[in-house]
């Protein structure tokens, strides 16, 4: 049995930002986005995840520009975004700011006119009529055949290209569970010989943590949506969070988010789906044990559904209304070891006199402590008492800068959907 993989050191306190390059600027280019790097760095972003930068198939394309996830060539860039050299310059600029770059990788399928369909038709699965097909109902892509060893070899070489040529820092692997686990074991083993990378899987399968550092929290996202629609209470949220802590390896990272490209385009913005709870739940996603994901435009906040297959730029207004909100949360994650992912940190819910409406919890590592208190209700909570003597002492409210002392006699007031985050002095 091979030795277990270990996360790169910088990943434990990193903050991830998903870049929808097409919609980010009017130009939708690598060069235009590069000008945004200092602002994102100042907001606390550490890692940039770029949706696929590869060319998009024309055959059976959806919309005018097509899906990022219908690749026509694994080792070149989408010329709408810019040249390979311009992408390299973007990576270099990010690295100069001590930021990391990971790219989206679509290993399960390609677009219908990928070069392999002509050069290596044996790389693809066939239906009963002998035709290329996709087994998931996606009309613009066709499935690769991982029973063919040549597919595995070619895919690994393509992934090596981006590490060696562009010096990227990791991969976000699209629908990773559709690709055999033993392939991912091999690819990480080989790529680790070139550079230690960060591996994020778009899946929630426990077994994939044999390879991947982090996986998605789709179950929690859907539970948050159900919570807002009044079909579940706080206990429903806590149940899913508990499962992440008990059913997964202690070393597993979980990616928490209130929105991403799929949710925004197909289901609506976080404000459509989570309503007044959106901000408090964003605090939860940034402070629970795991890694936070911020999607393009959340700092505005962007409240419109961005088109997925057509040009539909984010409507930046220069105000970045939630910049400071995220900056305070993300810099706390960067600086306070209590909010680290992985092992070695303690997390537990703090009982209160209003547990049906208040979700309070403690994060601790050594002497570092962070207390998070969320009013997850439509009602004001005027006299909240925290019934846990293990953390009593002096803390600073990260949003207001005011100091407070928690003791058996102290209490606090929270308006509907209000949140508070305290760092121990």
Short names for language-model regions:
Residues 250-272:
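Active-site clefts of carbohydrate-active enzymes
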Residues 56-61, 109-114, 179-182, 207-210, ...:
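Short catalytic/ligand-binding loop motif for oxyanion handling, primarily in non-cytosolic enzymes
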Residues 1-49, 55, 88-93, 238, ...:
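Carbohydrate-interacting/catalytic domains
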Residues 15-17, 48-50, 101-103, 171, ...:
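Hydrophobic faces of well-ordered beta-strands that scaffold small-molecule active sites
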Residues 22-24, 53, 106-108, 176-178, ...:
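Active-site beta-loop-alpha junctions enriched in small/polar residues
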Residues 3-15, 22-28, 37-46, 52-166, ...:
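Substrate-binding/active-site clefts of carbohydrate-active enzymes
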Residues 29-32, 82-86, 150-155, 179, ...:
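Soluble or luminal CAZymes and related metallo-dependent hydrolases
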């Amino acid at each position: 049995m091979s030795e277990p993989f270990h996360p790169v050191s910088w990943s434990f306190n990193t903050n991830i930002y998903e870049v929808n390059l097409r919609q980010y600027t009017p130009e939708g280019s690598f060069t235009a986005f590069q000008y945004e790097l200092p602002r994102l760095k100042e907001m606390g972003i550490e890692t940039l995840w770029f949706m696929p930068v590869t060319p998009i198939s024309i055959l059976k394309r959806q919309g005018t520009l097509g899906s990022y996830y219908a690749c026509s060539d694994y080792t070149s860039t989408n010329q709408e975004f810019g040249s390979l050299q311009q992408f390299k310059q973007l990576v270099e600029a990010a690295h100069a700011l001590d930021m990391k770059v990971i790219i989206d990788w679509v290993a399960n399928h390609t677009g219908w006119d990928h070069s392999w369909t002509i050069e290596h038709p044996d790389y693809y699965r066939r239906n009963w009529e002998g035709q290329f097909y996709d087994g998931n109902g996606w009309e613009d892509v066709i499935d690769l055949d991982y029973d063919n060893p040549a597919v595995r070899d070619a895919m690994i070489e393509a992934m090596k290209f981006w590490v060696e040529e562009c010096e990227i820092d990791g991969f976000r692997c699209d629908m990773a569970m559709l690709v055999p686990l033993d392939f991912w074991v091999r690819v990480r083993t080989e790529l680790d010989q070139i550079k230690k990378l960060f591996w994020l899987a778009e899946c929630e399968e426990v077994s994939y943590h044999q390879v991947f550092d982090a996986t998605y929290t789709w179950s929690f996202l859907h539970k948050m949506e159900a919570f807002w629609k009044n079909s579940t209470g706080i206990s429903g949220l806590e149940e899913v969070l508990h499962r992440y802590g008990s059913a997964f390896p202690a070393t597993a990272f979980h990616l928490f988010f209130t929105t991403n490209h799929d949710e925004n385009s197909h289901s609506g913005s976080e404000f459509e789906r989570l309503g007044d709870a959106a901000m408090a739940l964003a605090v939860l996603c940034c402070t629970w044990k795991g890694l936070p994901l911020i999607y393009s435009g959340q700092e505005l906040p962007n409240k419109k559904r961005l088109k997925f297959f057509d040009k539909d730029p984010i409507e930046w207004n220069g105000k970045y209304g939630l910049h400071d909100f995220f900056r305070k949360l993300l810099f706390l994650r960067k600086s306070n070891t209590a909010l680290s992912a992985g092992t070695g940190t303690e997390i537990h819910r703090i009982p209160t006199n209003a547990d049906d409406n208040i979700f309070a919890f403690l994060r601790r590592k050594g002497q570092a402590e962070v207390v998070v208190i969320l009013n997850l209700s439509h009602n004001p909570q005027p006299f909240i008492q925290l019934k846990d003597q293990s953390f009593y002492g002096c803390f600073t409210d990260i949003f207001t800068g005011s100091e407070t002392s928690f003791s058996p006699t102290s209490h606090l007031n929270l308006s509907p959907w209000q949140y508070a985050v305290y760092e121990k002095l």
